[in-house]
């Protein structure tokens, strides 16, 4: 099982606002010790590329994907922020010890 939150971006919020949302997720992690993935889904790969710059270096694991990559959210479309690894399935972003 993969535990995650998904943020569906419609391109209406500033990139700074997207980054600010991670503060609440970090507070959840600090209060509970539970560290789910936070997945941002973007309307375009261009918006995804821009957002990845402000979503880096956070306390919570963040991954991004975008429309137009072929397979949709269930496919090999997710990029872990802060990693140089290629796009992967969501399940492949979870360390093996955290899978259930």
Language model segments and positions:
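Electrostatic, structured charged patches in enzyme active sites and in nucleic-acid/phosphate-binding
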Residues: 1-100
